[in-house]
A protein has these predicted regions:
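A conserved structural/catalytic subdomain of Rossmann-like adenosyl-cofactor enzymes
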Residues: 2-4, 275-497
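Non-catalytic, mostly N-terminal accessory regions of nucleic-acid modification and defense proteins
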Residues: 1-200, 262-271, 369-372, 396-403, ...
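Conserved S-adenosyl-L-methionine
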Residues: 178-286, 291-299, 306-308, 321, ...
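Soluble or luminal CAZymes and related metallo-dependent hydrolases
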Residues: 8, 12, 239, 318
């Protein structure tokens, strides 16, 4: 087969997904397409590497060496073996998935478990439900995938990674309301990586990693800057089982081998610990779920990992619980983070005491207000909060505010950051100086004088001098935040009577 182009790869992957249209809801595409893509890829790479061993030393030599391959496929569990089946195809796929998962356990490295395919194909029940996935539908998708050889020679890891990320984005477009659970706008993620500037040999962590896009973009930063990236250790935790599997497949298909992705509730059961403390990392990126109400506040109030040093957040908003988890996960010397949050964390009265303590810690480095519509199913503007445990001397006692709400483009109903937007914002963070109507360095004393408010508009007047402009998305978001706070207060009062 001829080498596949990146555009052909994207096109054929999406056409395979569209075989499911009308059969299942669009939000469920990822449950089937990602495992099949991963299965096809590892089967073709296995064949490619096995053929190299045969050419090197013959069939017997290849059989011995196949046990040392990065991913092992047991006899009878290859893509071609499943392709030959015409009845109960879903059940046969499940058997192959389980056999491959069991044949590839995680390995131990530096006292932790790395890689491994246990559970990577995600939930299995849907495959054997013939009402949802009849044999002819599964066979059609398998035949569609079989048109191309997805070996490393035909499709290098970086191109496969691009195609996978493309598919994640397409599924987000199609999934609508559920997209934000697993996908963060990649141009925003690229900005966060540019601000934090990952380095070789560092440990990078995302406590709510979704499909792994923030981790991938951090490695892309190193690749794009010509720096060594394979020495980077990658860690993530994701509460959704299918989504954590998608993240692991994403990392594998991007050529990443040194990673640990855990499935579980980060607030209740943090996966990465060191004795009685959380493990710490050089760099943390996160887009925590916004203002969730269903979380174990009572356990956090007596958190055994010491993550409530600012206080215990209200039941109706877990934002500062995630914030404190992230701060506790930062290395004291090299630790830095970039977090996507709703603007409310900057000014809500119910979190005032926690915000005051945060300001006094002097780890806040930059607060960036970004444009509206950059998130699926959310028209609101958000902010990026950058913290550093060990701020440079000239930044101590000061915080940089950036008003980047106008640094956004929109095309085909999709909002995104252009390269020039990313460059402008990232350079402003690095220079840490005033820019008229865009950036302002503010002392902690001045923040105290402003009642410890951290909202960007408190410190930067970006309005037109000749017009009284009302920013409707910002005003609407502020109204929503106030309404939610009022509702929470009413609920609290009602419990007293």
């Amino acid at each position: 087969m001829a080498r596949i182009t990146i555009e052909d790869l994207k096109s054929f992957l999406w056409s395979a997904a569209e075989d499911l249209r009308g059969q299942i809801d669009a939000a469920g595409y990822k449950e089937y397409i990602f495992p099949l893509l991963f299965f096809k890829r590892i089967s073709d790479v296995y064949d490619e590497q096995y053929a190299e061993y045969v050419a090197e030393g013959g069939e017997e030599y290849a059989k011995m060496q196949s046990e040392e391959l990065a991913i092992r496929i047991p006899d009878g569990q290859h893509w071609q073996d499943v392709r030959e089946v015409t009845e109960n195809v879903g059940q046969r796929l499940v058997e192959a998935f389980i056999a491959i998962e069991q044949a590839n356990p995680p390995r131990e490295a530096d006292g932790r478990l790395v890689g491994g395919l246990d559970g990577i194909f995600g939930p299995k029940d849907g495959w054997t439900n013939k009402n949802k996935m009849p044999d002819h539908i599964i066979t059609s998708i398998i035949e569609n995938f079989s048109k191309y050889n997805l070996s490393l020679a035909n499709c290098p890891a970086d191109e496969m990674g691009q195609a996978y990320e493309y598919l994640v984005g397409k599924f987000a477009d199609d999934a609508g309301n559920t997209a934000q659970e697993f996908y963060t706008n990649r141009t925003v993620v690229e900005l966060m990586a540019e601000i934090l500037q990952p380095q070789p040999n560092e440990a990078i962590y995302d406590p709510t990693c979704g499909s792994g896009g923030m981790l991938i973009k951090s490695l892309d930063y190193l690749r794009n800057h010509g720096k060594e990236w394979k020495s980077v250790q990658v860690f993530g935790q994701e509460i959704n089982g299918l989504t954590s599997s998608i993240a692991r497949m994403n990392l594998y298909l991007n050529g990443v081998e040194d990673f640990s992705i855990a499935c579980g509730d980060t607030l209740r059961f943090p996966a990465f610990v060191d004795g009685s403390r959380l493990r710490t990392f050089d760099m943390v990126l996160a887009n925590p779920p916004y203002s969730i109400k269903e979380w174990d506040r009572s356990s956090f109030e007596h958190d055994k990992w010491g993550r409530n040093f600012l206080g215990t957040p209200p039941q109706g908003r877990a934002d500062y619980a995630f914030f404190q988890h992230i701060i506790a996960s930062m290395n004291d010397k090299t630790g830095r983070c970039a977090i996507l949050f709703p603007h409310g964390v900057l000014f809500r009265d119910e979190e005032k005491i926690m915000r005051e303590k945060l300001i006094e810690m002097d780890i806040l480095d930059c607060i960036i207000g970004i444009g509206a519509n950059l998130f699926y199913n959310a028209s609101m503007e958000a902010c990026i909060i950058v913290c550093r445990k060990n701020k440079p001397e000239h930044r101590k006692g000061r915080v940089l505010f950036i008003d980047a709400k106008n640094e956004v483009s929109r095309k085909d109903n999709v909002s995104f950051l252009e390269p020039e937007h990313i460059d402008k914002i990232a350079k402003a963070c690095e220079r840490f100086e005033d820019v008229d109507k865009f950036a302002k360095v503010v002392s902690i004393e001045d923040i105290r004088a402003n009642r410890n408010l951290l909202s960007v508009q408190t410190y930067i007047d970006s309005s037109d001098d000749d017009a009284d402009i009302v920013d409707i998305p910002t005003a609407l978001h502020g109204w929503n935040e106030s309404a939610q706070a009022l509702s929470a207060n009413v609920d609290s009062l009602s419990k007293l009577f």
